[in-house]
Structures are given as C-alpha cells and as structure tokens.
Amino acid sequence: MSKRILLLGSTGKMGLALRHIFRDAYLIIGKNSHDFDALNFEQVRTIIGESSPDIVINTVAFLGIDPCEKEPERAFRLNTLYPKFLAELSNSNGFLLIHFSTDAVFSDEKGDFYTEKDCPRPLNLYGFTKYGGDCFIQAITKRYYLFRIPVLFGEATKNNQFVEKMLQKIHEGQKVLKISGNIISSPTYSRDVAREVWRIMDASYQFGLYHIANEGKASLYDLMKEITENLNLDVEVEAASYKEFPFLGIKNTFTPIKSEKISPLRHWKEAVKGYCNNIEKGVHSSDRL
C-alpha cells in the first residue's frame, strides 16, 4: 500500500513539481490556500488529523524580502511559528516532515558558495523569519528533511514570482527588460529539486539539513537572458543594478549555495534548457504534469 503524503501548498511552483515527480509512488493529498489557512493552526491540525499522513511536505511560506518588510507579523507567523507548529505535530502524530528553506538566510560576506556547514546570518526579515522556522524544526523534531533552495524557475500556474512576472511582461508586448545583474544566486529548476528530494527519501538519507541547487551561480539578468534566448523571444534583456529599482529590505546580493552532502545537480543552464523545452511543449499547469 502506498504511503500517504500530505502536500501543503500543492499548487505552487514547488508543489506542482513535487506532485509530478511523486505521483506514481505515493498517495498524494494536495492542499492549498483554498483548503486551509496556514495562519490558522487549528485548521492545520484538523487537516493533518483527517489526512493521517505518513509524510507531510510543506511548501507554504511568505516569500520575498519586501513583502515581509511590509507585513512583519504575517512573515513571523507563516515563516517561523507555522513550521514550529508542524514540527510539534510531527512529534505528536509521528509523520516525517519535509520543509523548504532559502538561501536568504545567509549574508553576502563569504564571497563563495554557502554549504550546510556555514552559519546563517540573515540580512532582512524574510531571511530572519525563515531561519527561525529552520531552527525550530531542527530543535523540536528528529524526523525531518530541511531543504534549502535558491531562486527557483519552473512550471507555474500563477505569475507571482520573478521569472513568471518577466515572461508576462514579454507576453504583454514589452520589448526591453531591465534586470538586476548584481544579485547573484544559484538559479534552480523546481523539477530538479523535486527529483533530488525523491532520491534522498528513496535512499533513506540521514534526516537533517541539505542544500539543493543546480550547479553554478548567476545573476537574475543571466537567468532571464538564458531563458529568453532558449525560448527565442523577441526581447532585449539589459543588465541593471538592483539599486535602480524600488526596494525596502536589505538585499541578499551574493548567496550561491551548494551541498557538501549530496552530488551536484546538472548545471543551471542545462536545467533552463529542460524548463524551456517543457514550456514549448505547453507544460504549464498541473493538468498537464
């Protein structure tokens, strides 16, 4: 009998990728914001109790530096207290907890790739609240996988994240995109993350913290340049400084990550090719995953 996975945030970018990779081997119970409010912990408790999952995968978070600066209480509850509550339920209900963190828990000081051994030092409220959630999970439950991931590209149903926003602008006829060339991360394909999560689980890796990212580092400009070229889009992509755009919180300008625990994933440029091939095939929504 297949194990039961409760996937919280099942229609987001990471949720779609996980459903695609895990669907044949697990019974997946997908829940999104239409089904429950992650700020209402009693609703969360009820959904988990009714689902009786063997594994809970949480992709729900309050994303973004500026949104967190605007709504600090919401950021704290969703990114810190909500994962803490999931960790407590993991202990009491006996399920394996899988949670996703971010490269934004690091500062810009290292000048090299951050690994699992590096000590986080958040620069902004987003990173601070996410790191708080990480700490609670590590302190409260023993049966967990905590995956730190960088900026993601991948199939999506909403145009509410960086790559989708840029592609929407192109779709609307914009011919020139000015994009930050001085924010460096490790662009990563959501499906590659999902495959690696599967591999780690299937091989019964030791519980704990893992960094998952495509190999290499790049700016947001580099990423969109690569995507638009692979899709043969009629648009000019220009590099700019992040300081040319409005912002509230302190930016993470150099946070590429890699793992010292697992083998490197394919290079981010190869991952972009795979992503763009899927876009050209019309693979966008969960109906076609």
Go through the PLM ranges and name each one:
Residues 30-42:
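Rossmann-fold cofactor-recognition segment
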Residues 3-21:
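N-terminal Rossmann NAD(P)H-binding glycine-rich loop of SDR-like oxidoreductase domains
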Residues 77, 81-82, 105-147, 152-153:
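Catalytic helix-loop patch of NAD(P)-dependent Rossmann-fold dehydrogenases
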Residues 196, 203-246, 276, 283-289:
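Mid/C-terminal beta-alpha module of Rossmann-like enzyme folds, strongest
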Residues 8, 31, 59-60, 97-103, ...:
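SDR active-site strand-loop-helix element
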Residues 235, 252-289:
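C-terminal amphipathic/interface module of NAD(P)-dependent oxidoreductases
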Residues 135-185, 191-192, 198:
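NAD(P)-dependent short-chain dehydrogenase/reductase
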